[in-house]
């Protein structure tokens, strides 16, 4: 019998609406997909998130808007609904981003607008026969927008030319745009001094193909433990990713303001789950926050069918990004992305249990009952002794009705997994893959035994698992009809080979903040 370390989450049957995540953003109603236009307002100390939004239905369709939400801490959100809309009902405001034009390079602002709130949106305007790049600007800090009267600002006569990501490049004193020529598998890099006149600098090609590229990003990311940084190019693939449907890849390299050059020929996956797409970072993030971004927590293979009620789709939790050198195997160490979930000051523990040094078969190592929200986190450090009988599990169990979501580790294969095969929502959909997995080298060795770390969050119908400090992640949605959050969370150890060094489980809730 193969042994594995598993976490299982079961839930009571209540009402569909209660499966809404607590911390990950969801629209109040309607359809949502890609995150757009994230930026930080340093005057009001406020994070802004925009998103692809259809307020008229819970499936994708036109007219397509940008929705808008804000947060003080990236965990508690206020939704404002539709913000930028198309000129005609058959058109759409497709993905793009927002920059803070502190120095008024665009000329859109006068001195009455605080430099910290000179907000400019750059987005794809989609019609039946064209995709062109448009600009709009806000005179109230990002709540309402005026469209630039001379739109479009960029048109290459291609119907698959979309998803601009713009940022200020200080060394060359210019704005940079990365944008996808989607079905040519090409990321174009443009430059501008005023956000309205753009010149092509170079093209980047490479990586996993799939059907098309979307939602690129380019940002400088610090390398942990050094004073150095590297540039990271993010590219979304849909459909046809190696994980099935939608996913994100990234490349690490250098950027001189004109050309991105990867350090190697390897395309790295950002997440090994099924529900992580269109990742984007926040512009103007405070230095102490580092590089912050989030993704759409869904997959185009089944996004329109997710069994929620008045709303459909969520974002992931916000994540902080760094780079670190880590082993891919015993012989090769490479620079890789580390992702760590962000919990704002509004997130507190309603309940918490910690235990250490759990050895061998302990079938109720840790158990925590739902007290308020049924939103849980778990943090486990464990070692594996391959000389012992590896049969058994480490698992977390809850509820009635026999449905479950599992996450865990198989010591025989040396891999982590998430298993949503015992959930009935979308069970008949052939693309709602039961199991996803990730391989990572041990976090460290102690007493000649491999040691691993697994941190996870179960938030409504979303599970996000972070392995070995975020060197690999697994993000998956799951749908148990009528869930009202997890009823309890239990860690079990039934394997002689697994020694739990330390464990902590929390029930999380949100408190009011000023």
UniProtKB/Swiss-Prot annotation:
User: GO CC terms on record?
Assistant: extracellular region; fungal-type vacuole
Instruction: Extract the signal peptide range.
Output: 1-18
Catalytic activity annotation: Hydrolysis of terminal, non-reducing (2->1)- and (2->6)-linked beta-D-fructofuranose residues in fructans
Task: Cite the active-site annotation.
Answer: 34, 214
Under SMART domains, the record lists: Glyco_32
Tell me which Gene Ontology terms the entry assigns under biological process: inulin catabolic process; raffinose catabolic process; sucrose catabolic process
| Chain positions recorded as substrate binding sites | 33-34, 52, 60, 95, 162-163, 214, 300
A Pfam family this chain is assigned to? Glyco_hydro_32C
Keyword Magnesium included in the entry's annotation? no
The EC number(s) given in the record are 3.2.1.80
Q: How does activity depend on pH?
A: Optimum pH is 6.0.
Q: Specify the glycosylation sites in chain numbering.
A: 56, 104, 110, 197, 203, 357, 371, 389, 422
Induction details:
Expression is up-regulated by inulin and maltose, and repressed by glucose. Ammonium sulfate, ammonium chloride and urea are inhibitory for inulinase synthesis, presumably because of the release of ammonium ions.
| Disulfide bonding pattern of the chain | none
Describe the thermal dependence of activity.
Answer: Optimum temperature is 60 degrees Celsius.
- Classification via InterPro entries: ConA-like_dom_sf (IPR013320), Glyco_hydro_32 (IPR001362), Glyco_hydro_32_C (IPR013189), Glyco_hydro_32_N (IPR013148), Glyco_hydro_beta-prop_sf (IPR023296)
- Coiled-coil stretches, from where to where? none
Which top EC class applies here?
Answer: hydrolase
- The answer on whether this UniProt entry bears the keyword Transmembrane reads no
The UniProt entry's sequence similarity note says:
Belongs to the glycosyl hydrolase 32 family.
Q: What does this protein do?
A: Exo-inulinase involved in utilization of the plant storage polymer inulin, consisting of fructooligosaccharides with a degree of polymerization (DP) value from 2 to 60. Splits off terminal fructose units successively from the non-reducing end of the inulin molecule.
PANTHER family given in the database record: EXOINULINASE INUD (AFU_ORTHOLOGUE AFUA_5G00480), INVERTASE 2
Its recorded name reads Extracellular exo-inulinase
Species this protein is from: Meyerozyma guilliermondii (strain ATCC 6260 / CBS 566 / DSM 6381 / JCM 1539 / NBRC 10279 / NRRL Y-324)
């Amino acid at each position: 019998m193969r042994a594995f370390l598993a976490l299982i989450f079961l839930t009571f049957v209540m009402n569909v609406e209660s499966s809404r995540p607590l911390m990950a953003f969801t629209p109040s109603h309607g359809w949502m997909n890609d995150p757009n236009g994230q930026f930080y307002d340093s005057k009001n100390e406020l994070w802004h998130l925009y998103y692809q939004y259809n307020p008229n239905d819970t499936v994708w369709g036109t007219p397509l808007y940008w929705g808008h939400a804000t947060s003080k801490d990236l965990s508690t959100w206020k939704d404002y609904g539709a913000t930028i809309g198309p000129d005609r009902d058959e058109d759409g405001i497709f993905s793009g981003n927002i920059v803070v034009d502190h120095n008024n390079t665009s000329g859109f602002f006068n001195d009455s607008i605080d430099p910290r709130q000179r907000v400019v949106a750059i987005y794809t305007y989609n019609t039946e026969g064209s995709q062109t790049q448009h600009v709009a600007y806000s005179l109230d800090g990002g709540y309402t927008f005026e469209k630039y009267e001379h739109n479009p600002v960029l048109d290459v006569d291609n119907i698959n030319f979309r998803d601009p990501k713009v940022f200020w490049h200080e060394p060359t004193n210019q704005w940079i745009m990365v944008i996808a020529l989607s079905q040519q598998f090409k990321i174009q890099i443009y430059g501008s001094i005023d956000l309205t006149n753009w010149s092509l600098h170079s093209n980047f090609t490479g990586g996993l193909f799939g059907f098309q590229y979307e939602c690129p990003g380019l940002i400088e990311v610090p390398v942990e433990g050094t004073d150095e940084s590297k540039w990271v190019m993010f590219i979304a693939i849909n459909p046809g990713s190696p994980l099935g449907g939608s996913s994100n890849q990234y490349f690490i390299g250098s950027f001189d303001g004109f050309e991105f050059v990867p350090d190697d020929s390897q395309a790295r996956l950002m997440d090994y789950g099924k529900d992580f797409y269109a990742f984007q970072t926040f512009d103007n993030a405070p230095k102490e926050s580092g590089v912050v971004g989030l993704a759409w927590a869904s997959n185009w293979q089944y996004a329109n069918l997710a069994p929620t009620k008045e709303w459909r789709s969520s974002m992931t939790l916000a994540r902080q990004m760094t780079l670190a050198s880590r082993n891919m195997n015993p012989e090769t160490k490479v620079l890789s992305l580390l992702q760590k979930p962000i919990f704002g000051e509004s997130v507190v523990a309603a309940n918490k249990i910690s235990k250490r040094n759990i050895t061998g078969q302990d079938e109720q190592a840790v158990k925590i009952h739902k007290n308020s929200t049924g939103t849980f986190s778990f943090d486990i450090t464990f070692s594996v002794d391959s000389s012992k009988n590896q049969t058994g599990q480490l698992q977390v169990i809850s509820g009635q009705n026999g449905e479950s979501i599992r996450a865990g580790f198989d010591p025989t294969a040396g891999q982590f997994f998430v298993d949503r095969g015992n959930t009935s929502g979308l069970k008949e959909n052939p693309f709602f893959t039961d199991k996803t997995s990730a391989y990572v080298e041990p976090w460290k060795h102690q007493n000649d035994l491999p040691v691993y770390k697994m941190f996870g969050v179960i938030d409504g119908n979303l599970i996000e698992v972070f392995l070995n400090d975020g060197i690999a992640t697994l993000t998956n949605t799951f749908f148990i009809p009528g869930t009202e959050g997890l009823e309890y969370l239990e860690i079990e150890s039934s394997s002689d080979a697994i020694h739990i060094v330390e464990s902590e489980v929390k029930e999380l809730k949100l408190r009011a903040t000023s």
